């Protein structure tokens, strides 16, 4: 991008937990989807990692917001501010003019027209000139390297922070899909609730997230892959005295069981609605897992045992949607039928 570049192309995975931006085939932004605003003026104080450091720690003058819930925009103004702040991180170096932005943004396949309009409006208010939307499972499939135009069935399960997107793809279209608002955030809430009920310790959302990363599991038996216990510090729910509680992966697996079962049922439901020929392709090719949820220990094995079809974790599950959106953006003419 030189001095006279007036159009900049960016691909964005606008996620409930994290927002990823790709420009010139490189990940240039990978930040938490959090913004801190001045309560009086609504002026942005911080965005991304800096705002997340403030999350659950602010005083009355500052509010920290996660503008997306369940994969869709919950706070339009905050989302616009956050997008603007994150896009500014892309604009490095000195330019005489701010470039016009050509954007492709990944959106949940179960989004309503109103929800799609909200994403488009936020992007346009954040200086997007040409804004295209692509459904997340389709973007994930492209990012994984699947030939989405082939006359062959492939299934993607994209587990994000706010929603799980399940789609059967063939001939450049989504044949059957199931978008449920059960995902990574629900696993975090399960851990918070479990720690409070079982150990009488209050843990923040961020601490529950750390527990999920360190000892989160979908299976109660991980064998050699078992992580060490994680020590949790927090106040006693009743006495407010400090506590130190070791947590093992087996108990976390038990507390996540119901939420994971919902994801299993959603996958089975999508398979039920899949035509037999495509179903045979999926059994042969296996099912692809992407999104942050794909990193939960043992999830692929649990799903495989339950559904009796091989599951593969994408090579870079956290960035599959963003990479796919980036490829679609570079080949807009070829993939125009996938854009909205």
Q: What function would you assign to each model-found segment?
A:
Residues 1-159, 167-287, 294-340:
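Nucleotide/phosphate-binding catalytic cleft detector across ATP-hydrolyzing
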């Amino acid at each position: 991008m030189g001095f006279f570049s007036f159009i900049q192309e960016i691909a964005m995975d606008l996620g409930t937990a994290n927002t990823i931006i790709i420009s010139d085939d490189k990940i240039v932004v990978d930040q938490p989807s959090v913004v801190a605003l001045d309560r009086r003026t609504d002026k942005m104080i911080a965005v991304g990692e800096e705002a997340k450091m403030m999350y659950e720690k602010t005083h009355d003058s500052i509010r920290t917001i996660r503008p997306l819930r369940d994969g869709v925009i919950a706070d339009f103004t905050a989302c616009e501010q956050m997008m603007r702040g994150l896009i500014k991180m892309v604009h490095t170096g000195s330019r005489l003019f701010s470039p016009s932005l050509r954007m492709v943004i990944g959106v949940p396949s179960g989004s309503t027209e109103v929800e799609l309009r909200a994403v488009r409006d936020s992007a346009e208010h954040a200086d997007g000139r040409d804004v295209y939307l692509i459904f997340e499972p389709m973007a994930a499939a492209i990012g994984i390297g699947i030939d989405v135009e082939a006359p062959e069935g492939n299934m993607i399960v994209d587990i994000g922070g706010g929603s799980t997107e399940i789609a059967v793809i063939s001939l450049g279209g989504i044949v059957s899909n199931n978008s449920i608002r059960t995902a990574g955030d629900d696993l975090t809430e399960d851990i918070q609730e479990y720690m409070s009920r079982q150990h009488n310790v209050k843990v923040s959302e961020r601490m529950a997230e750390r527990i999920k990363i360190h000892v989160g599991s979908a299976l109660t038996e991980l064998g050699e892959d078992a992580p060490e216990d994680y020590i949790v510090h927090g106040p006693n729910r009743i006495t407010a005295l400090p506590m130190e509680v070791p947590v093992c992966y087996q108990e976390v697996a038990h507390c996540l069981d119901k939420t994971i079962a919902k994801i299993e049922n959603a996958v089975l439901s999508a398979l039920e609605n899949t035509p037999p020929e495509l179903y045979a392709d999926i059994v042969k090719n296996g099912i692809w897992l992407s999104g942050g949820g794909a990193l939960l220990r043992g999830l692929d094995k649990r799903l495989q045992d339950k559904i009796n079809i091989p599951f593969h974790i994408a090579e870079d599950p956290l960035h599959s949607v963003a990479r796919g959106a980036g490829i679609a953006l570079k080949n807009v003419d070829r993939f125009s039928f996938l854009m909205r």
